[in-house]
Amino acid sequence: MTIRSPEPEVKIMVEKDPVKTSFEKWAKPGHFSRTLAKGPNTTTWIWNLHADAHDFDSHTNDLEEISRKVFSAHFGQLAVIFIWLSGMYFHGARFSNYEAWLSDPTHIKPSAQVVWPIVGQKILNGDVGGGFQGIQITSGFFQLWRASGITSELQLYTTAIGGLIFAALMLFAGWFHYHKAAPKLAWFQNVESMLNHHLAGLLGLGSLAWAGHQVHVSLPINRLLDAGVDPKEIPLPHEFILNRDLLAQLYPSFSKGLTPFFTLNWSEYSDFLTFRGGLNPVTGGLWLTDTAHHHLAIAVLFLVAGHMYRTNFGIGHSMKEILEAHKGPFTGEGHKGLYEILTTSWHAQLAINLAMLGSLTIIVAHHMYAMPPYPYLATDYATQLSLFTHHMWIGGFLVVGAAAHAAIFMVRDYDPTTQYNNLLDRVLRHRDAIISHLNWVCIFLGFHSFGLYIHNDTMSALGRPQDMFSDTAIQLQPVFAQWIQNTHALAPSLTAPNATASTSLTWGGGDLVAVGGKVALLPIPLGTADFLVHHIHAFTIHVTVLILLKGVLFARSSRLIPDKANLGFRFPCDGPGRGGTCQVSAWDHVFLGLFWMYNAISVVIFHFSWKMQSDVWGSISDQGVVTHITGGNFAQSSITINGWLRDFLWAQASQVIQSYGSSLSAYGLLFLGAHFVWAFSLMFLFSGRGYWQELIESIVWAHNKLKVAPAIQPRALSIVQGRAVGVAHYLLGGIATTWAFFLARIISVG
């Protein structure tokens, strides 16, 4: 760390009135492009309009202008999020049974949507308990609201209005910071300042504010709710905040004020900042005193982290220096040059952020069931399944997006002359070794993982169960996973002697938490069946990575097409007269990667859904006997392909197929409709552009005959557009089919 003289004076980092506000300009479609602004000659125009409207790189080469547009668009995005959130809270206030659910969360199901009987669809309003008719929701908002300390629908109303105010503020900020006071490029590139503010402000103060809310509002209200106090009798949030004695009745250390803090007797506060582990037996959620403690600790960490980087004060770390100092004995120039990449290519920056956020989202999916953070979440099986599925899909899309933007960076922003012998250059130079090894791994995993299933199917068909890979014949136990489970189950006694349980009940030990006769969580046993399907996970993930990484590493050039960078990010083939060069563009790799991402995530959510129904979820008798939803059939049924088809897909589809005439009938229609959308995609994916152009020309001829020819000439979709439409419908159809299948099933049996 070097000490240097501080900056002489504060620099002016904004430009006043750079772009005038003009509704006339915005009203003109395609105003951002000279070609598009001329208006449509052919139907291709509308496709290009949508493809390029947000491709700011194509509007201008000026990095400052691009940065401002991205910055402004972020405010627009935040406005949309606030409007969406406001809508969720408004539905909770206006159309929900939240107050009824709060009074009896084990018997009443959450609902915040009531269907209007316009053409007789009032059948969809099922009885969710407590005399309320509506659609059962599975978003987890009720559980989140209870954890936040919301006790009435009036509070939801006011929060909804607050959301709209914030949305308006964001829309104003987006306009203001583009048209009135736009930051200069140097401001966007000032990474140290940005790190300090984002770490200390967003994450540090954000966590501190949430911890404060949890301690002063959530904890006392939830403690009273857990004790069975009527929500209407509970003091309002501001009373707890303003009246310390109220809090001290529930948490005695409050009467001591800040004295223990300044005298370093922090353990005095252990009545509301705990380290218990496990779940609250009343609600089946994490102890809220544990989560308050967690957020306070996170706040401290990030407040420190937000003071680490060198700005005007000449003290602290410099990002450029850190990166350039990173040199290993075998890595050449190391990270040299990466600072310049990340401050001049927003695609490179975005690629890293998407990869990190996508991975994090998938980690969140797993924590939501292993450590259910909100009260009564763990026993709401439909919500648990929905949250897991949702976070897995989102994580998959973000990771594919990371590869997409990494490839765009390679094509548009990478300058080989400035990157010599640093890590990026070295990776690119041995890309053939990387991709061929990865390919070998994929072949190995594919044949071996699938081969184990095929072996089992064959032995099963031949009536030789003793020769199958299973827990009762030839065992393939996941010994490493079991070891990890075991060490974590035993860890608290060694590392955290005051903790009453391990971080998650899933690790093992004898603990089982049940709420209202339903299992919240118990130790999850892993066996041969899990070993088999985990290798399918490994296979699908590696193939997805192979496709995406090949797209990035060969985005600029390959042995087949050395000048690929000149062809751009997306192109159908390497021109006429050169056969066998289609589907080589970076865009095509993203397109192909999406299908394997869909494969990978589908297997994960199928595994989760069946495993939880078989080995975790179920009811518990007064004698303590657990009856699982599918009676523990996962271990013996999921070890064959036939078992997956018969005992999972077919057996569990009975609810969605038989949903007609019930309140779940919408899922039956969705199941049907989404299958259609999925099949519709194949029409785009399995036919070439020429076929359609030929058809269109014959239809246009007929129109000419009748003198009703359009002024705008109809054109078939380009090859790339056809693929985009195809993959969009494939994914939409596939995901909506899964959604209907999962929800009809779990709402019926959960």
UniProtKB/Swiss-Prot annotation:
It comes from the Eukaryota. It is found in: Plastid, Chloroplast thylakoid membrane. P700 is a chlorophyll a/chlorophyll a' dimer, A0 is one or more chlorophyll a, A1 is one or both phylloquinones and FX is a shared 4Fe-4S iron-sulfur center. PROSITE patterns: PHOTOSYSTEM_I_PSAAB. Its EC number is 1.97.1.12. Chlorophyll a' binds at residue 675. It catalyses: reduced [plastocyanin] + hnu + oxidized [2Fe-2S]-[ferredoxin] = oxidized [plastocyanin] + reduced [2Fe-2S]-[ferredoxin]. GO terms for cellular component: chloroplast thylakoid membrane; photosystem I. Phylloquinone binds at residue 692. Keywords: 4Fe-4S, Chlorophyll, Chloroplast, Chromophore, Electron transport, Iron, Iron-sulfur, Magnesium, Membrane, Metal-binding, Oxidoreductase, Photosynthesis, Photosystem I, Plastid, Thylakoid, Transmembrane, Transmembrane helix, Transport. This is Photosystem I P700 chlorophyll a apoprotein A1. It comes from Physcomitrium patens. The gene is psaA.
